[in-house]
Amino acid sequence: MSDQVVLLHGLGRSCASVARLQSGLEEMGFAALCWSYPSRRRRLAGHIEAFREWLRRQAFAGPVHFVGHSLGGIIIRGALADTPPVAIGRIVMIASPNQGAGVVSRFGRWPFSRAIFGLPLQDLGEKSPALMSLGVPEAEIGIIAGLRHFHPLNAISYVNLFHRAGHQHDGTVELANTQLEGATDSIAIDAHHTFICDHDE
């Protein structure tokens, strides 16, 4: 039987944003599926509990691997940190703000920000209590971070032109803030936060 992989997309995205990853995993022989969730409509704790409940309803045979982009990686981390509902294989977190995102700390309270990005924004600022209270799953965890600051199709890129000079970041999350104590490995690639899942590497 093929190893099973569950993918989670990021905030404001859909499973289409990780479709290339999913196809690549399937070509490699994995049984891959994506959990689709209404990313703007719940705070972080609500997403974590919804994902845990979804996992409990699945009939997985053997350990399950997980791949999460941005918020998706944080949800995976929270759902699997304590008494995980399934046997865990490996975890890959792609551009996930484990220590929060500075741009959220600076602009997350603005009404337009919450209108666009929804409820989770309250929990994704640097050192937010919701993030700092999360544990770390007992599993091999790989972190992939991006280093491309600007993409013309990403609105936050234009904000960052004036507010993030001198920092290594992917246009949304600082490189340092993707890191997680207890992670097995970490790499950084020349990719922008929003489009990192389509990067050739």
Regions found by a protein language model. Give the residues of each.
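Helical cap/lid subdomain of alpha/beta-hydrolase-fold lipid enzymes
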Residues: 81-201
